Amino acid sequence: MTEGAILLLAPDRSYRTAAYVHAATSLDIPLVVAAWGAADLSLPGQGIRIDSSSDESALKTIREVASKRRFIAALPTDDSTVALCQKAAEMLDLPANAPEAVEASTNKLIFRELCRDAGVATPSFQRVQINDTSK
């Protein structure tokens, strides 16, 4: 059994959350789901509500829970929780991605440019402005 819990940050009703909950249960890993919205939490009694409109408020709630329960990792389920998860991990002194990595993981253009520049095979692409009338 793990000595701490994993903090899973998920948007309300993410279809991905169930897979994380199932995996943690199967591996006997304690999991706390931090989610926003009105839907029931995936783990009754093991979840916390966070404010999606304010990172500061969400982080305050996470800090309060962390003062009573040790977290060993923080994971996001979706693009919409990647940046908050990075901030939470840093706040809790857990391993975290650099802000540049967070940006690249949630921006396809930046990710493809980084891959191309590093010599990683990537599909051809070009930036297109939606309001571009030159073509």
What are these regions (language model features)?
Residues M1-A101, S105-I110, D117:
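ATP-binding N-terminal substructure of ATP-dependent carboxylate-amine bond-forming enzymes
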Residues N107-K135:
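Active-site nucleotide/adenylate-binding loops and adjacent lid/helix of ATP-dependent enzymes
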